[in-house]
Amino acid sequence: MYLAKVKGNIVSTQKNSSLKSHKLLLVRRIDLAGKYIGIKDEIALDLIDSGIGDIVLVAKEGAAVQQILGHKNAPVNTMIVANVDDLDIQED
């Protein structure tokens, strides 16, 4: 899993039946300070009603995502699993 920031919505009027009624969002990894890591955006399935600008926890592993969906053949491997309200990090 990793932290990411939601950068945008993806509108899809036709998609695989196991993905219907679920939002697709564009996310980019961030570090613990909230700074973007790299320039690569990813598409993530959203089940928790995240929005643009939200900091989220993303699972990127096909079997875990398919288990959450309850559908072992779902064509997805990246999913938003939590909205992050706060990070409390202890400095060494």
Locate the predicted segments by residue:
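Short, structured beta-strand/loop micro-motifs enriched in basic residues and often containing a Trp
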Residues: G34-D41
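Conserved binding/recognition cores within well-folded domains
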Residues: G8
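C-terminal structural segments of small proteins and small subunits
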Residues: L57-A59, A63-D92
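Short aromatic-glycine-enriched beta-strand elements
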Residues: S18-V27
